[in-house]
A protein has these predicted regions:
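FIC/Doc superfamily catalytic core
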Residues: 1-183, 187-304
Length: 304
């Protein structure tokens, strides 16, 4: 699928989603809450948490995970879930104060000395070869990034998905390059992606830990050296398509089935179906890490 095809398909899916959203707001809230644990587990896994999805669900249900787990990982799951739940139910506009409050929640019981504040004085941070912004300028740089995001989305045609996804991608890259906190930058940054989608009436996305070295880290590294955020825009477009496909399928189809079962019935090789799913040329989506699709979906055969 070409870049043009992605945006055309995304525009079509957003329009379909918005029509469903007016009639199924409660169902969409439940879908978002049902995938909360998966989003939490994946975001923490990007930061090397060892908690599985089952572990995370146990923690969020008030139980201890199986086996020997670090207490920090338990706090990480509970705290990120609290921030995500606030995002899904809240209406407060995106601001520096909101970011700091969410950061305080995220690091509560983990790094109370650093929770809810920007880096200070000699609190420099490094991720691999990337050095975060000078701590003396962090507050101003983040304020500038927020101002630019507001300007980008104000100028953008809200009906044109490319402009708003591009603005969110640029902000995320800039946020991660600044690295405003001593700890928790990645998790808060990914929360902010979904806050921005939420404010635009769009569903949350899940950045997958398994694909971080292929899909997520390279666009951040490229932006840090070239100011080019196109790779992040492309990634967020595909993740948003997947999220829309999931919601449209759950609201309009009687059953969803594993992609492997659909591929067998459609006489398509499994690896071909999986590749189509990754490129979102079919309306497949992941539930509990497994590719899934509406049972009644029939792929259109191009004319010969």
């Amino acid at each position: 699928m070409t870049a043009t095809d992605v945006w055309t398909r995304l525009d079509e899916r957003i329009r379909a989603y918005q029509q469903l959203r007016t009639r199924h707001s409660q169902a969409l809230e439940q879908i978002a809450l049902a995938e909360l644990a998966e989003g939490v587990q994946q975001s923490n896994a990007i930061e090397n948490s060892t908690l599985t999805l089952d572990d995370t669900e146990a923690v969020l249900a008030g139980r201890l995970p199986a086996g020997r787990k670090e207490l920090r990982e338990v706090f990480e799951a509970k705290n990120l879930a609290a921030v995500t739940a606030d995002l899904l139910t809240g209406t407060e506009p995106l601001s520096t104060d909101l970011i700091l409050r969410w950061h305080a929640t995220l690091l509560a019981g983990i790094r109370d000395d650093a929770a809810g504040r920007f880096r200070r004085a000699n609190e420099w941070v490094r991720v691999g070869g990337h050095l975060g912004a000078n701590p003396g300028f962090v507050s101003g740089l983040l304020a500038d990034a927020l101002d630019r995001y507001r300007q980008d989305t104000t100028r953008a045609d809200r009906e044109a998905p490319r402009a708003v996804v591009d603005a969110i991608a640029r902000f995320h890259c800039e946020f991660e390059v600044i690295h405003p906190f001593v700890d928790g930058n990645g998790r808060i940054g990914r929360v902010l992606i979904n806050k921005q989608f939420h404010d635009l009436g769009l569903p949350p996305v899940i950045v997958r830990a398994r694909n971080r070295d292929r899909d997520y880290y390279p666009p951040l590294a490229r932006y840090a050296t070239t100011d080019d955020h196109e790779g992040m825009t492309s990634l967020l477009a595909l993740l948003l398509l997947e999220s829309l496909h999931k919601r449209i399928a759950l609201l309009t189809s009687a059953r969803v089935i594993p992609l492997a079962d659909w591929a067998r019935a459609a006489e398509i090789r499994g690896n071909v179906a999986a590749n189509k799913a990754r490129r979102q040329t079919i309306p497949a989506f992941r539930m509990r890490h497994r590719w899934t699709i509406a049972e009644d979906y029939h792929e259109m055969t191009p004319p010969t």
